[in-house]
From Swiss-Prot:
It holds the Pfam family PsbL. PSII is composed of 1 copy each of membrane proteins PsbA, PsbB, PsbC, PsbD, PsbE, PsbF, PsbH, PsbI, PsbJ, PsbK, PsbL, PsbM, PsbT, PsbX, PsbY, PsbZ, Psb30/Ycf12, at least 3 peripheral proteins of the oxygen-evolving complex and a large number of cofactors. It forms dimeric complexes. This is Photosystem II reaction center protein L. The chain crosses the membrane at residues 17-37. GO terms for cellular component: chloroplast thylakoid membrane; photosystem II reaction center.
Length: 38
């Protein structure tokens, strides 16, 4: 049971990519709001 499960690694990778995607969407939303409200 000391061997790491490759499924856990893929889940961790998906979670990291999901956080990066949300961060990218947030930054784009801020940039677009600044562009439209100026």
């Amino acid at each position: 049971m000391t061997q790491t499960n490759p499924n856990e690694q893929s889940v961790e990778l998906n979670r990291t990519s999901l956080y990066w995607g949300l961060l990218l969407i947030f930054v784009l939303a801020v940039l677009f709001s600044n562009y439209f409200f100026n």
